[in-house]
């Protein structure tokens, strides 16, 4: 059995990392309205951004790291994911990134981040940190007041009570509530998923990996990914080998998720690894850099690997975020605010709000969200959620950024073109128009919200007169912030939500007449079920390990009623049909 080329089935049902470079969201947002400063709570211009499927927080980290290059601004990030494990990883990543330097040094934080974020297996020391941090977060989730006191940058208030309970259960599982490696045998799960994905080509998996890397990722701009690190990740799931490979043997429980499978004619819940096994975590931070010396070549070969560039970029991000938070922590308008009490904690200059999982089509019903956001980001796996209802939450003149499928190795050029065309159709139906003044990009599609303002830029208030240079942020056409070296910002794209992992493409270039129809090219989306830890005792009794479901992985095929997000975006009908979920 071999999956046809272009099927897009290598990316799983849950996305754990971004598949395109990180964005500075300030560079993507419209100019600041100077009149809005007096309307905000802190008398400081605010950026309200809604992110669908950002997955790993890379856009927010990049935005905070480059905030010192822009005029003072406060950030309100509203994040919507399609599973609570992704929400939990967001919380873990930011709690690590914002850890006090006295408790954990910069290098240790960056190395711990890389392993938790991109490695299927961990070192024992990192696994111990994960257990301790997960236990701490599990105790904070049920206590909103204590959570806001200790983590003032985080808000879980929009989440439903049952979602908070399930989120707590996820952290309990991470902290070792269920003992033993057999609870989540990552190495076996990775190998079984790889066997099912490659099928008859499993014995030639190294050749398949080389083909995908050299003929696809390298051709699409990711030349710095070295074949040794790509092969190692495809074989073992370890992307960043910061120590000897033998040191990595503890399963990374943050990559565990659940789904419904068919077992002897019944639907049962199973825990497994349903993430990406095709592209890898190298694209998010590893193929672009502000320091161009990292990208230089010698004799036609890059002098640095994607792993080395990723480690450098993450370290610089953490250093810049720490430097920005220190002197520029917002306590309100300094001229009008009384001196704070000695014991009062400084207010964070940003807040991350996590929204309910199914709220994309109901946000516009709340007046606090209607017309609020200056920027909307949508990953390619969430494009099916872009609708006129969601567009109503964007202010006139606000910007929309949609990631494209450039780094999805299962997709052929004609499928990539069809996806890009479909994105334009969906965005226009939602009330957006393409930006014509920006440089064309194969990674992101950029739009602006139609309204009272003209194409010239942003809100009508911005166009009514000249804006003081101290407040006006650069226009979207000049994407880079005002700095001397004009270093381009990293761009990011979040991975699509894909289902089962049928095989990769054949070793030889596919024939034109072998291309599957567009409806079959993208990976299907998994059944969304609550975290296994949050189930009732009766439900928990039917939870089976993945290996117990059936022989080899015959029953791992997605149920026929599940619809893929990317497949839905490529459907030829003009209407966006809602996803059908298995109950």
UniProtKB/Swiss-Prot annotation:
Cytoplasm listed as a keyword: yes
InterPro entries xrefs: DNAAF3, DNAAF3_C, DUF4470
GO aspect biological process, one term: axonemal dynein complex assembly
Compartments (UniProt record): Cytoplasm; Dynein axonemal particle
Pfam family, one: DUF4470
Keywords: Cilium biogenesis/degradation, Cytoplasm
Stretches the record annotates as Disordered: 455-534
One GO cellular component term: dynein axonemal particle
The organism's place on the tree of life at top rank: Eukaryota
The protein's role, per its UniProt record: Required for the assembly of axonemal inner and outer dynein arms. Involved in preassembly of dyneins into complexes before their transport into cilia.
Family to which the UniProt record says this protein belongs: Belongs to the DNAAF3 family.
Protein name: Dynein axonemal assembly factor 3
Biological source species: Rattus norvegicus
Gene that encodes the chain: Dnaaf3
């Amino acid at each position: 059995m071999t999956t046809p080329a272009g099927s897009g089935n290598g990316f799983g049902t849950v996305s754990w990392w971004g598949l395109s470079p990180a964005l500075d969201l300030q560079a993507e947002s419209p100019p600041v309205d100077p009149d809005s400063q007096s309307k905000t709570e802190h008398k400081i211009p605010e950026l309200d951004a809604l992110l669908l499927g950002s997955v790993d927080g890379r856009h927010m980290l990049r935005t905070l790291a480059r905030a010192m290059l822009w005029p003072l601004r406060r950030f309100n990030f509203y994040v919507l994911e399609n599973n609570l494990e992704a929400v939990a990883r967001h919380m873990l990543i930011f709690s690590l990134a914002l850890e006090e330097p006295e408790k954990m040094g910069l290098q240790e934080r960056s190395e711990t981040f890389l392993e938790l974020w991109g490695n299927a297996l961990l070192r024992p020391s990192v696994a111990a940190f994960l257990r301790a941090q997960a236990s701490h977060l599990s105790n904070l989730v049920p206590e909103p007041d204590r959570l806001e006191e200790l983590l003032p940058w985080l808000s879980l208030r929009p989440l439903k009570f049952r979602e908070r309970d399930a989120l707590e259960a996820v952290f309990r599982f991470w902290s070792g509530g269920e003992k033993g490696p057999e609870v989540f045998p990552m190495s076996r799960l990775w190998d079984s998923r790889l066997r099912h994905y490659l099928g008859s080509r499993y014995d030639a998996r190294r050749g398949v990996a080389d083909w995908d890397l050299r003929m696809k990722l390298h051709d699409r701009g990711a030349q710095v990914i070295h074949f040794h690190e790509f092969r190692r990740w495809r074989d073992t799931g370890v992307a960043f080998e910061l120590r000897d490979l033998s040191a990595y043997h503890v399963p990374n429980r943050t990559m565990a998720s659940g789904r419904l499978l068919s077992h002897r004619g019944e639907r049962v819940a199973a825990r497994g690894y349903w993430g990406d096994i095709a592209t890898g975590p190298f694209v998010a931070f590893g193929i672009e850099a502000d320091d161009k010396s990292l990208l230089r070549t010698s004799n036609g070969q890059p002098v640095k690997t994607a792993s080395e560039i990723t480690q450098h970029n993450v370290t610089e991000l953490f250093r810049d975020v720490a430097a920005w938070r220190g002197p520029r922590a917002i306590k309100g308008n300094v001229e009008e605010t009384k001196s704070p009490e000695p014991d009062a904690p400084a207010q964070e200059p940003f807040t991350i709000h996590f929204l309910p999982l199914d709220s994309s089509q109901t946000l516009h019903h709340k007046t606090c969200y209607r017309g609020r956001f200056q920027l909307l980001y949508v990953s390619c796996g969430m494009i099916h959620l872009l609708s006129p209802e969601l567009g109503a939450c964007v202010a006139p003149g606000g910007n929309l950024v949609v990631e494209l499928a450039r780094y999805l190795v299962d997709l052929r050029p004609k499928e990539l073109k069809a996806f890009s065309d479909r994105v334009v159709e969906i965005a226009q139906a939602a009330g957006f128009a393409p930006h014509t003044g920006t440089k064309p990009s194969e990674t992101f599609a950029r739009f602006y919200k139609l309204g009272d303002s003209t194409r010239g830029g942003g809100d009508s208030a911005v166009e009514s007169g000249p804006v003081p240079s101290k407040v006006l942020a650069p226009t979207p056409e000049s994407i880079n912030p005002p700095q001397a070296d004009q270093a381009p910002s990293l761009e990011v794209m979040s991975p699509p939500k894909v289902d089962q992992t049928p095989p990769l493409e054949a070793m030889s270039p596919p024939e034109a007449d072998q291309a599957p129809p567009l409806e079959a090219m993208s990976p299907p989306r998994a059944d969304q079920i609550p975290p296994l830890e949050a189930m009732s005792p009766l439900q928990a009794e039917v939870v089976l390990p993945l290996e117990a479901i059936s022989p080899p992985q015959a029953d791992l095929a997605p149920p026929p009623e599940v619809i893929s997000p990317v497949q839905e975006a490529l459907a030829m009908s003009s209407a966006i049909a809602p996803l059908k979920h298995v109950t």
